[in-house]
Amino acid sequence: MFRWGIIFLVIALIAAALGFGGLAGTAAGAAKIVFVVGIILFLVSLFMGRRRP
């Protein structure tokens, strides 16, 4: 998940540097969403892993 977030962030930075504002905003938004989902899944797996069967 974090890998995809970083990929979208790099795409957003490159698009912003080249002047593609709409694409940069879309890629930055996707990077934020993927990053938040990754954090949530990490926290869920962290707490679920500590439970006893």
From Swiss-Prot:
InterPro entries: DUF1328. It comes from the Bacteria. The chain crosses the membrane at residues 4-24, 28-48. It is a multi-pass membrane protein. Keywords: Cell membrane, Membrane, Transmembrane, Transmembrane helix. One of its GO terms (cellular component) is plasma membrane. Its main location: membrane. The keyword Transmembrane applies. It is found in: Cell membrane. It holds the Pfam family DUF1328. Belongs to the UPF0391 family. NCBIfam families: PRK13682.1-4 (NF010229), PRK13682.1-5 (NF010230). This is UPF0391 membrane protein ESA_03375.
